[in-house]
Amino acid sequence: MIPGMRATPTESFSFVYSCDLQTNVQVKVAEFEGIFRDVLNPVRRLNQLFAEITVYCNNQQIGYPVCTSFHTPPDSSQLARQKLIQKWNEWLTLPIRYSDLSRDAFLHITIWEHEDDEIVNNSTFSRRLVAQSKLSMFSKRGILKSGVIDVQMNVSTTPDPFVKQPETWKYSDAWGDEIDLLFKQVTRQSRGLVEDVPWLDPFASRRIEMIRAKYKYSSPDRHVFLVLEMAAIRLGPTFYKVVYYEDETKNMRVSTSVNGGVGIVSACTRYCVADPELLLESLAEVKHSAMTRRIRDVEDERHRQVKPNKQAKDRLETIVNLPSSQVLTREQRDLVWKFRHYLRQFPKALNKYLRSVNWVHPQEVKTALALMNDWELIEAEDALELLSSAFTHPAVRAYSVSRLLEAASPEQVLLYLPQLVQALKYEQGQQLPEEGNPVPVVSEEEGKIPSVATTPTEELEGRDMTVVTKKEARKAASGDLATFLIDYALASPKVSNYLYWHLKTEIESTKESKEEHSKMYQNIQDRLMEALVKRPDTRAQVDSLHQQQIFVEDLIILMNEAKARGGRLNESKSAEFRTMLSRAKHMLDLKGVHLPLDPSFRLSSVIPDTASFFKSEMMPAKISFKVLQPNGKADRNIPEEYTVIFKTGDDLRQDQLIQQMVRLIDIILKKGQLDLKLTPYLVLSTGVGQGFVQCIKSKPLRAIQEQYKAHKMDCIREAMKELRPGDGPFGIEPNVIDNYVRSLAGYSVIMYILGLGDRHLDNLLLCENGKLFHVDFGFILGRDPKPMPPPMKLTSEMVQVMGGVKSKQFLEFVQHVDSAYRILRRHSNVLLNLFSLMLDAGIPDIAAEPDKAIFKIEQRLRLDLSDEAATKHIFTQIESSLNAKMAMISDIIHAYKQNLM
């Protein structure tokens, strides 16, 4: 035994569970030592090094990497004598708590070198990887590693968190029992199991380090090591090991051996007793509620005349005004039930009443359905809530469909169509009709309802847009939502066109995840086609849909072949695509196929010279088509050309949803007498990973900034002045400036409420008339690939167009933002209802956290605030956006990346 190293009388194993430690993981980066030799450049010397540590749990990166600060390198004498390359002695706090670590958690450790000779945009320093390694945080027995650890580093050029790591340096059994005992005693001393000898410990430590270095560098391979110190858990004189354990209990468990030990108090052990009734409903409250409601089931005149006092009225008003996404408490449900007859006169209270019904109680259900039919009629936007997954009773869903039929305009049905298609998932018993039972179709001789604009085609032009009388339509619609949609499709070629493509997309997207939904959508699509075939005036629509399908498939084939043949450069691929289009006879004569994106237009032929690929990973194509003019004569209302962007490999359903919200917000604001000059362009997903986007004539702000960079901050304003000079503010036409101010305000509010991410100057477009709009919505609901994104995209150049923050135009901008925010808060339910129906649609940013999607929108609307407080809140967001420095840095980095492409 080494002199002076005496064990304590008892060696109990004291530990805590990892789930009980609510503090962040800490690691001390001490030294980088060894003999470094670059094979490619033997004379290379390291300079300006820093270490970086990234945490991985379940093979996923957790948070951002944490790096050391700058330290001057050691002098040459230390480097030669002690093999010291860099010294930090710095504690790093990692962005994860011990309680959140997974069993397979590990650290990816990298050593980087600054390169002084390359500076990117004066903001980003280039760096070169020197070495890397990974360190498992738990041992094979599930004990968190602690104390000083020599991590062997691999000299590398490319960072790889899953790099194959050699075993951490250890002593060898071949060195003898004494060396083995030495290092075991060192470990015991770090755990406090060896008594300290003050006069001897310094000498022993230096000698141990010399022995360690001798054996560590004895290998012929030139190794480099990073010395780390993992934080230890200590309470008084006792050190505790951290044992991995999954438990949600917050009380820390301290365990000792049976025999106890010096400094260990067995009485400190605490245990948490499980409560099997935790989070369950109180049986007393359940019984009280059942008895109360059972008494009131006897509907007599006395109960019908029950009216709330002032205090109860205030509470009821608060409940009725709650957002549709908020769950009612038991007390709130009982209060609504108690005064249900009083609330019957308020249409918006119906949904809250139906949420208060106990649907497993037959008598209560019977009473609720009878009262529902006597309630004041609700609006179409409130009927959408009754089609969500929260309402499964067929009678309630049938009532919702009947209200859509009576209260919703054809334009509203067309607007809500994606959500209505999603709501089919919650319908019961959607199946093909049995043989002998024909599909219900609309009558050709009964009364009419307003129809959506017809498609200008010889086969469909002038078609009688008829459905059954409202009485018979309600009877047909009372069965299921699918019948309602098919009936509407028969009345409108536009609805049937979009319904067909929405169903096709859902058939493909649910085929792997939920086959029963895919079959259900396939059945409904078959019903739609069968119903169209049966009516003479709708048969042409079936042929039109088949032609569109062939047109889309041909377009995909040509695009894929052009990408494969065109070489590596984007320009060569675009040239190949133009050549292939010019040789494709079927594309030069499209025979008047209806454009799936907008079936109001029929296409005559493609214009090959206009085709090109965008510089992006998926390389979408921009294509222009000649529009077929009716009777061969030019029509002022029909453009000669129609330009689209066709994408493959991108899921357009998220962009489609955002544009639907923009269109809805535009309608809501205009009803509130506020026109913010929004530009809701068309987006249609024609399948999984494919679809059309309407191309609006405009220019990205990035291109404007580059073209007019000589004007610096005034670049956008100078571009507008050159294109539309006038006698208005800043020498620009007055309506152009007004369009810019209003559209900027509108999209700023939309960006904030919907949490649009990845906003840069390439996806902000400006039209010649001054209207600004956003494109490409790959990140929504607060998700953003850039750190610290601003609530609104307001760059200095964009504000300078209005004359700065002290100008009259900027004041108008702020007022428009405030007015729009107030109006949208008053119509929050329709936004929340539409998003709630999309929770199971598989849209990427909603599917990531479906339980939080609605809450994120509700949180940004701040429905808990008064109008005055909401005004202060939105003003704060504007101020925060104006002062966002990180957004400016992100724009610089994005521009640099685009220039490299």
UniProtKB/Swiss-Prot annotation:
Its cofactor is Mn(2+). The keyword Amino-acid biosynthesis does not apply. It comes from the Eukaryota. GO terms for molecular function: 1-phosphatidylinositol-3-kinase activity; ATP binding. InterPro entries: ARM-type_fold (IPR016024), C2_domain_sf (IPR035892), Kinase-like_dom_sf (IPR011009), PI3/4_kinase_cat_dom (IPR000403), PI3/4_kinase_cat_sf (IPR036940), PI3/4_kinase_CS (IPR018936), PI3K-type_C2_dom (IPR002420), PI3K_accessory_dom (IPR001263). Catalytic subunit of the PI3K complex that mediates formation of phosphatidylinositol 3-phosphate. Together with bec-1, mediates the production of phosphatidylinositol 3-phosphate on intracellular vesicles and thereby regulates membrane trafficking. Plays a role in endosome-to-Golgi retrograde transport of mig-14. Involved in clearance of apoptotic cell corpses by phagosomes. This is Phosphatidylinositol 3-kinase catalytic subunit type 3.
